[in-house]
Regions:
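Transmembrane alpha-helices and adjacent helix-loop boundaries
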Residues: 1-222
């Protein structure tokens, strides 16, 4: 028992370094996914059926196939076509593309939940569709989308562990490397799991805090 505890203490710098990288990878993937997801959401709401169809196909493919398969196709598959990526860019692209598919549906639903009368009211005072979207619709849609997007981010933090399969040095990969040297399988994966749990708990608490702040603003606009 003491040896296991000492191993965790000795390995802590490597695990924490991996945890920091996990958060960086998650933030980068979430940000890029939100940008692409917003574009896809607008495409899904387009009156042009080819544009809408393309967005639907993208979302269907990336939501309907395993993330690990997507990572493998990007990292191991693209070199067959002369496109070679280092592990970190490959993971970032894969996580971003996958996140975008889920974010698109969340954002589309949030925008669609806003009363359509607000579009008409904005048009009546001379606002363009983009001005209406930016000034009236998006601020309200953001409040609706915050809880599911926060949950998606927490899931993304855990999903980054799949990047270990393409040699990305995030938390789970660090645990794998230490395990291969020490053969302490249970100890190291338990330590890594606890770090994931702490990160998820902290992020969940932050989510609840921001949701409560938004709810207070709705009840008391002043």
């Amino acid at each position: 028992m003491q040896e296991s505890i000492q191993l965790v203490i000795d390995s802590a710098p490597f695990l924490l370094k991996g945890a920091v990288f996990t958060l960086q990878l998650s933030i980068g993937g979430m940000f890029s996914g939100l940008v692409l997801g917003f574009i896809l959401a607008l495409m899904r709401m387009s009156p042009l059926w080819p544009v809408k169809w393309l967005a639907r196909m993208y979302i269907s493919i990336f939501r309907g196939t395993p993330l690990i398969a997507q990572l493998f196709m990007i990292y191991y598959g693209l070199p067959q076509f002369g496109i070679e990526l280092d592990p970190i860019p490959a993971a970032m692209i894969g996580l971003s593309l996958n996140t975008a598919a889920y974010a698109a549906e969340t954002l589309r639903a949030a925008i669609a939940s806003i009363d359509k009368g607000q579009w008409e009211a904005a048009a009546s005072i001379g606002m363009t569709p983009w001005q209406t979207m930016r000034r009236a619709i998006l601020p309200q849609a953001a409040r609706v989308a915050l809880p599911p997007l926060s949950n998606s981010f927490i899931s993304l933090v855990k999903d980054t562990s799949l990047a270990a399969t393409i040699q990305v040095p995030e938390l789970f990969r660090q645990a794998q490397l230490i395990t291969s040297r020490t053969l302490e399988v249970f100890t190291m994966y338990l330590a890594a799991s606890l770090i994931y749990w702490v990160m998820a708990t902290v992020l969940s608490s932050l989510q609840n805090y921001f949701e409560n702040q938004l709810n207070r603003q709705e009840r008391d606009p002043k």
